[in-house]
A protein has these predicted regions:
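Cyclic-nucleotide recognition modules
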Residues: 72-131
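Short, Lys/Arg-enriched N-terminal segment that forms or immediately precedes the first helix
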Residues: 8, 136-146
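Glycine- and acidic-residue-biased ligand/ion/polar-headgroup-sensing regions
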Residues: 38, 49-62, 77-80
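A generic structural motif
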Residues: 62-64, 103
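Short, Lys/Arg-enriched anionic-surface-contact patches
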Residues: 79, 143-156
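Cyclic nucleotide-binding regulatory module and flanking cytosolic helices
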Residues: 1-31, 87-89
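Short phosphate-coordinating micro-motif centered on Lys-Gly-acidic
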Residues: 41-46
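Phosphate-/nucleic-acid-contacting segments
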Residues: 151-201
Length: 201
């Protein structure tokens, strides 16, 4: 087993019990795939037939707005899964609800929809795993909406590093601004205000 699959298998067994034979069978039905920086590998409206597990790199999930910019809903980093949010109904020809773009060169494990169906049908705890993965995404999106609607910009900025460690050193500041729902200028002023506040303590 490669170290890449060890990372994925560790993710799985943190949440459900699986035998070595089940993990081996699952790994054999997946593939390691690489994407270039800037590559959009999931596109809104296109059929989604796989989910991805990040081994290395950062991804943003976003939509284009009607005013010519984009709105970032979340980031995905090492050890996280990526999906266009349509996949977990386990139906064929589901269309992605967001775009997924690599901010860095990325290496991922591709998990085809047929593999997910196989796991849920034939593995002892496969259905539980599928349910956990679906619920995790729903909970994450609910937390995003709640934070957006109830927390101040400064509070959301302060939790950014907790949600995505070291991400500010790895991605353009305009993307952080998009995630927070503010302009890059506003973000720059916010960071300066934060530094000034810390210096006064």
């Amino acid at each position: 087993m490669s170290n890449h699959f060890k990372m994925l298998n560790s993710f799985i067994i943190r949440h459900v019990e699986m035998s070595e034979a089940e993990l081996k069978s699952f790994n054999e039905k997946c593939e390691i795939i690489e994407f270039s920086k800037g590559e959009i590998f999931i596109k809104i409206g296109e059929p989604q037939d796989s989910l991805f597990f990040i081994i290395k790199g950062i991804v943003r999930n976003y939509v284009d707005t009607n005013v010519g910019d984009s709105k970032i809903y979340n980031f995905r980093t090492e050890g996280m899964q990526v999906t266009g949010y349509a996949l977990y109904n386990y139906k064929d020809s589901l269309k992605a609800l967001v775009n997924s773009q690599c901010i860095e060169e990325c290496k991922m494990i591709k998990v085809p929809l047929q593999t997910i169906k196989y796991v849920t049908e034939y593995f002892k705890n496969g259905e539980r795993l599928g349910r956990y993965m679906a619920e995790a995404h729903v909970i994450e999106m609910m937390n995003y909406i709640i934070k957006r609607d109830t927390k101040s910009i400064i509070e959301r900025y302060d939790t950014l590093e907790l949600d995505y460690p070291n991400i500010q050193q790895r991605i353009p500041q305009r993307m952080i601004a998009s995630y927070l729902g503010i302009t890059p200028v506003h973000l720059s002023n916010l960071k300066k205000s934060r530094r000034d506040s810390i210096d006064k303590k």
